[in-house]
Amino acid sequence: MHVTQEQVMMRKMVRDFARKEIAPAAEIMEKTDEFPFQLIKKMGKHGLMGIPVPEQYGGAGADVVSYILAIHEISRISAAVGVILSVHTSVGTNPILYFGNEEQKMKYIPNLASGDHLGAFALTEPHSGSDAGSLRTTAIKKNGKYLLNGSKIFITNGGAADIYITFALTAPDQGRHGISAFIVEKNTPGFTVGKKERKLGLYGSNTTELIFDNAEVPEANLLGKEGDGFHIAMANLNVGRIGIAAQALGIAEAALEHAVDYAKQRVQFGRPIAANQGISFKLADMATRAEAARHLVYHAADLHNRGLNCGKEASMAKQFASDAAVKAALDAVQIYGGYGYMKDYPVERLLRDAKVTQIYEGTNEIQRLIISKYLLGGT
């Protein structure tokens, strides 16, 4: 894929910002597991929170490839910050940009694009993970408002976000065709944030429960029409999956970089361990998988950029890159030996952060199912 001068400049700017601002913040996040509010504000001031948002709504007006470049570079330094940005943009802002009316766009997107507000995506429920069409949260219209009742779990940016793209049943007897999408503001009466989950990795990125107890959402906050919700969710998951693939690619490349440096410096039996085929072959395989993942990620991003169907390619990129990230992190820990198991060394964190990329935004089993349906004519 040809990279434009603008994309090269974007990559350099993000890389410099990540090393200067994100790296030290990531160390604090790892120790405290606290959300990096001040860092997000800085990212907003640098134009990173609205990269693909048109300038008329306060964004940078860049393309999807530039946005994916940013997630990729940030995730090399901090996968936690990478997922905060990915969820905010791909599924917290884009649903309004793609499916909102002009009034909704003008009301919400400028604050999201500037980083003054943070976005989240509330789809997953205790009883519906991979089966996104089996929601139980309901939205009953009454006196010009929708009353939402139910709960969501595993919501990235939960408790930190100002805007939640929320999915609920307006016609429970119609299954997925009865799902609608709503813009829910954080101070909505009847809406509360539940417990914050304690996770294996991605420290500092909030993952929470959301509770709706007759939450009063104005009729004006319905996205699209009643019954459009499932389509809205699935349409935005494509770019969301490319974003997670870029996050995984960043992890894989970071693991490779650390492993190469360590293998060249660590001396055993009178020579660097990189001189041993058992190590050098691991590094070669890590590099090959990372390069293959990079091509899949940017091919999918380029297709999306050109308005072409990228469902299969997004799933391929997400599945392959996340598998590559986990394998790279595992191999990096092995190359580090006992040091790799210790929190004082970076590869331990990479391994913990990598695992979830195989799970969220659709498990890799779901990705393989999607790919096979494209191949067999099921979509």
From Swiss-Prot:
Reactions the enzyme catalyzes: a 2,3-saturated acyl-CoA + A = a 2,3-dehydroacyl-CoA + AH2
A single cellular component GO annotation: cytoplasm
UniProt keywords, alphabetically: FAD, Flavoprotein, Oxidoreductase, Sporulation
Stored Pfam families: Acyl-CoA_dh_1, Acyl-CoA_dh_M, Acyl-CoA_dh_N
SUPFAM superfamilies, A to Z: Acyl-CoA dehydrogenase C-terminal domain-like, Acyl-CoA dehydrogenase NM domain-like
Cofactor(s), by name: FAD
Entry-linked InterPro entries: Acyl-CoA_DH_CS (IPR006089), Acyl-CoA_Oxase/DH_mid-dom (IPR006091), Acyl-CoA_Oxase/DH_mid-dom_sf (IPR046373), AcylCo_DH-like_C (IPR036250), AcylCo_DH/oxidase_C (IPR009075), AcylCoA_DH/ox_N (IPR013786), AcylCoA_DH/ox_N_sf (IPR037069), AcylCoA_DH/oxidase_NM_dom_sf (IPR009100)
MF terms (GO), sorted A to Z: acyl-CoA dehydrogenase activity; flavin adenine dinucleotide binding
EC numbers: 1.3.99.-
Highest taxon above the source species: Bacteria
Induction: Subject to catabolite repression.
GO biological process, one term: sporulation resulting in formation of a cellular spore
Family: Belongs to the acyl-CoA dehydrogenase family.
PANTHER family xrefs: ACYL-COA DEHYDROGENASE, ISOVALERYL-COA DEHYDROGENASE, MITOCHONDRIAL-RELATED
Protein name, per record: Acyl-CoA dehydrogenase
Organism per entry: Bacillus subtilis (strain 168)
Phylogenetic placement of the source organism: Bacteria, Bacillati, Bacillota, Bacilli, Bacillales
